[in-house]
Amino acid sequence: MYSHLSFMDKVKLEQLLLSKIFLKKNGEQNISAIAKYLNRHRSTILREIKRFKTIDEYSAYKSDKMYYEKRKKNNKRFKFTEEQLNFIHLRFNVYHDSPSELIYRYFLKFKVKFPVCVKTLYKWIRLGFYGFLKQNLRHHGKKYKRKGKSDNRGKLTDFKSIWDIDNKVSNVGWLEMDTVVGKDHKSAILVLVEQLSKKYFAIKLENHTAREVEKKFKDIIIKNNLIGKIKGIITDRRKEFSKWREMEIFAETQVYFCDAGSPQQKPLIEYMNSELRHWFPKGTDFNKVSQKQIDWVVNVINDKLRPCLNWISSKEMFLQNI
């Protein structure tokens, strides 16, 4: 893959030209030998030298300065219309669409291809072009690191393991369940996600007890008319889910628990929780967040066009299958 000469490459080239180590018998510079020494193609070295009238005039500093001046003039940024810019700002800075989703929505809206690829759009966002705000990316534009800590918030005994699941033919009707905890563990949200459609549900908890979790679980089931439609629920071995038998009876389903300290066994809910955390970062006091605010965020999440669903939303996929 071709790459431009770095400043240090140019310094080495200048030193080699001045030292006259690679001279031919006729006194001319052996460009092929220099290129081989620098591990570059002969044409690359020739193009670099031809920036100057003669080889003796070559200067690494001047060459680098000329390079950056040309780069500044070569501004290929696309000129959007006012309507297009407003749409981009709305989708990215308000609804926080991912770059790939923004490109797809742009195509649906204007019936023309987005002017750049996903990789270049990420570059635009990080450089702040067109008013893009980097903090609206997932994880606010920072690299995500797993801490590898085990969960020590209380464990359950006497339950069904995920290894007890038999004859799971598809993800239709299978839910994953979790709680998202707020500041100082004094507030929380109960969350569920349907595996096939990625439809996300979230409701505030008044407290972090098993009885409250059971109550809010029933509210979600009733509101979404899910009684008898759930094939199974996968969750953690935490004490707030100790009323799992009551949940099974009410929803006419089965509840299965992951191995201790193994959140990777329910990867979808962990991923969806990170989307919720994008709006409500760690340290958020959910006692100060209304259910209306949570509903707005959940609606934005469920309205996202997802590549894994062939560019339809979780909301639409859920209605088609449940």
From Swiss-Prot:
This is Putative integrase ORF3. GO terms for molecular function: endonuclease activity; nucleic acid binding; transposase activity. NCBIfam families: transpos_IS30. Transmembrane segments: none annotated. One of its GO terms (biological process) is DNA integration. Belongs to the plectrovirus integrase ORF3 family. InterPro entries: Integrase_cat-core, IS30-like_HTH, RNaseH-like_sf, RNaseH_sf, Transposase-Integrase, Transposase_IS30-like. The keyword Hydrolase applies. It comes from the Viruses. This protein may encode an integrase, which is necessary for integration of the viral DNA into host genome. PANTHER family: TRANSPOSASE, TRANSPOSASE INSI FOR INSERTION SEQUENCE ELEMENT IS30A-RELATED. It comes from Spiroplasma virus SpV1-R8A2 B (SpV1). It holds the Pfam family rve. Residues 153-322 form the Integrase catalytic domain. Keywords: DNA integration, DNA recombination, Endonuclease, Hydrolase, Nuclease.
